[in-house]
From Swiss-Prot:
<feature type="DNA-binding region" description="Homeobox">
    <location>
        <begin position="256"/>
        <end position="315"/>
    </location>
</feature>
<dbReference type="InterPro" id="IPR001356">
    <property type="entry name" value="HD"/>
</dbReference>
<keyword id="KW-0804">Transcription</keyword>
<dbReference type="GO" id="GO:0000978">
    <property type="term" value="F:RNA polymerase II cis-regulatory region sequence-specific DNA binding"/>
</dbReference>
<dbReference type="InterPro" id="IPR009057">
    <property type="entry name" value="Homeodomain-like_sf"/>
</dbReference>
<keyword id="KW-0238">DNA-binding</keyword>
<comment type="function">
    <text>Sequence-specific transcription factor which is part of a developmental regulatory system that provides cells with specific positional identities on the anterior-posterior axis.</text>
</comment>
<dbReference type="GO" id="GO:0005634">
    <property type="term" value="C:nucleus"/>
</dbReference>
<dbReference type="GO" id="GO:0000981">
    <property type="term" value="F:DNA-binding transcription factor activity, RNA polymerase II-specific"/>
</dbReference>
<dbReference type="Pfam" id="PF00046">
    <property type="entry name" value="Homeodomain"/>
</dbReference>
<dbReference type="InterPro" id="IPR020479">
    <property type="entry name" value="HD_metazoa"/>
</dbReference>
<comment type="similarity">
    <text>Belongs to the Abd-B homeobox family.</text>
</comment>
<feature type="region of interest" description="Disordered">
    <location>
        <begin position="190"/>
        <end position="249"/>
    </location>
</feature>
<dbReference type="InterPro" id="IPR017970">
    <property type="entry name" value="Homeobox_CS"/>
</dbReference>
<protein>
    <recommendedName>
        <fullName>Homeobox protein Hox-A10b</fullName>
    </recommendedName>
</protein>
<keyword id="KW-0805">Transcription regulation</keyword>
<keyword id="KW-0217">Developmental protein</keyword>
């Protein structure tokens, strides 16, 4: 601050700091040689500065007073060198450091490796002139990346190494995984084709046990002699399967529709005899009949239920017929 020690200058400083912005045009003080700009021109005036504590007008030792709050660092780049009361503009050269000159200082702080940073393109950033003298362009985009001086060089080096490792290693890993995946797919496809070619021709599914019982009850032909060649065996098994499907599929006819009467004449005759003897069967008797007729327990049970419903329907019709015969409707 290039201000004189006269009491008038000190009183000007105290008044300007305490009252903040002054209204009207700029003021010029002859004793101190300071020109103050009006606050309408600059929005950032002196209202943001801190107040001096314990300062009076007529004190001559006001230079030893320390402000309560520190100056704002960003104000240095806004001010001009023409004003004598402002803080001087820092030079573009490197400012002297507080540490001893024996410590070696790096010329530049770079986020990336030194190989990727050509020295020809190093430029100077104005906004970070006090913090970093030089900046280094990144490898991905041509713009400059300013690094503040409070970053340690060891931290930036470690981050740059980790960044390069993360960028290079996953490419090899992905390539190896993709090649292994493709090779495994091709091997699986080859094994599947081999299995399909080596599989023997499968025969049709065998008929269930109840179908065999029905064939035995209907008196089908006995099993033929074992054939000599495998081709004959295949033809015989296919013919037997077709016969068993046609004769033993007791719920569906050849055309695919549901059969009206899935039981054979022999089975129906045996069940009618038992029904005339007893309409309701016990479990033991039902098991005996199912063995004799080559049917399951459930089939015999369903047949007796249907037969009882049929008898009930017939008796109802006969009763209605008898009642209608007595009355003549003319």
């Amino acid at each position: 601050m290039s201000c004189s020690d006269s009491p008038s200058g000190n009183s000007f400083l105290v008044d300007s700091l305490i009252h903040g912005r002054s209204e009207g045009s700029g003021h010029y003080y002859q004793n101190s040689g300071v020109y103050l700009q009006p606050t309408s021109e600059y929005s950032y005036g002196l209202s943001n500065c801190g107040y001096f504590s314990g300062l009076k007008r007529n004190e001559s030792n006001s230079q030893n007073v320390v402000p309560t709050c520190g100056p704002y660092q960003g104000m240095e780049t806004w001010l001009e060198t023409s004003r004598s009361c402002r803080i001087e503009q820092p030079n573009s050269q490197i400012t002297p450091r507080s540490f001893s000159p024996t410590i070696k200082e790096e010329n530049s702080y770079c986020l990336y490796e030194s190989e990727k940073c050509p020295k020809e393109t190093i430029t100077e950033d104005i906004s970070y002139s006090r913090l970093t003298p030089n900046s280094c362009p990144s490898s991905n985009n041509n713009g400059c990346v300013p690094v503040p001086g409070y970053f340690r060089l060891s931290q930036t080096c470690t981050t740059s190494k980790g960044f390069t490792d993360n960028q290079t290693i996953p490419t090899h890993v992905v390539a190896q995984r993709s090649t292994r995946f493709d090779s495994s797919l091709s091997a699986i496809a080859a094994e599947a084709s081999r299995d399909e070619s080596d599989e023997p021709p499968t025969c049709a599914p065998c008929a269930p046990g109840r179908n065999k019982e029905l064939r035995g009850s209907t008196g089908t032909a006995s099993s033929p002699e074992p054939p000599d060649s495998p081709e004959k065996a295949v033809t015989v098994t296919k013919a037997g399967d077709s016969k068993s499907e046609s004769t033993a599929n007791w719920l569906t006819a050849k055309s695919g529709r549901k059969k009206r009467c899935p039981y054979t004449k022999h089975q129906t005759l045996e069940l009618e005899k038992e029904f005339l003897f007893n309409m309701y069967l016990t479990r033991e008797r039902r098991l005996e009949i199912s063995r004799s007729v080559h049917l399951t327990d459930r089939q015999v049970k369903i047949w007796f239920q249907n037969r009882r419903m049929k008898l009930k329907k017939m008796s109802r019709e006969n009763r209605i017929r008898e009642l209608s015969a007595n009355f003549s409707f003319s």
